[in-house]
Amino acid sequence: MMKCPQALLAIFWLLLSWVSSEDKVVQSPLSLVVHEGDTVTLNCSYEVTNFRSLLWYKQEKKAPTFLFMLTSSGIEKKSGRLSSILDKKELFSILNITATQTGDSAIYLCAVE
């Protein structure tokens, strides 16, 4: 199968959080354009009073699709080409997408509850 180097993927972020006004969730980068086949790392940092879990979602045209729920530090969750890990000490999580495909083009959401 031949890869098209001109194929681009757009990865967008939105903030989705169920936290109080003094709590904060920050995602980076806010938007990203990558080539098909690249590896992408999306970051989510947070400052919350009462942490229960961190959730990742992918939103295409309709309602967001659940990807991962992370509650414990250092335990990597995987699903196909996607993986995520949580660091509760440093208050952040990453979402990795390997071998990106055009179907990965979407809005990715990080939420803390």
Swiss-Prot record:
Which compartments is it annotated to reside in? Cell membrane
Example GO CC term: the record gives:
T cell receptor complex
Glycan-linked positions: N43, N96
Chief localization: membrane
Q: Which UniProt keywords apply?
A: Adaptive immunity, Cell membrane, Disulfide bond, Glycoprotein, Immunity, Immunoglobulin domain, Membrane, Receptor, Signal, T cell receptor
**A Pfam family name for this chain?**
V-set
GO BP annotations listed: adaptive immune response; response to bacterium
Span of the secretion signal? 1-21
Which residues are in the Ig-like domain? 23-113
* Keyword flag Signal: yes
- The cysteines joined by S-S bonds are C44-C110
Q: Key word Kinase present in the record?
A: no
This chain's function reads: V region of the variable domain of T cell receptor (TR) alpha chain that participates in the antigen recognition. Alpha-beta T cell receptors are antigen specific receptors which are essential to the immune response and are present on the cell surface of T lymphocytes. Recognize peptide-major histocompatibility (MH) (pMH) complexes that are displayed by antigen presenting cells (APC), a prerequisite for efficient T cell adaptive immunity against pathogens.
What is its quaternary makeup? Alpha-beta TR is a heterodimer composed of an alpha and beta chain; disulfide-linked. The alpha-beta TR is associated with the transmembrane signaling CD3 coreceptor proteins to form the TR-CD3 (TcR or TCR). The assembly of alpha-beta TR heterodimers with CD3 occurs in the endoplasmic reticulum where a single alpha-beta TR heterodimer associates with one CD3D-CD3E heterodimer, one CD3G-CD3E heterodimer and one CD247 homodimer forming a stable octameric structure. CD3D-CD3E and CD3G-CD3E heterodimers preferentially associate with TR alpha and TR beta chains, respectively.
The protein's name: T cell receptor alpha variable 36/delta variable 7
The uppermost taxa in this organism's lineage are: Eukaryota, Metazoa, Chordata, Craniata, Vertebrata
Gene designation: TRAV36DV7
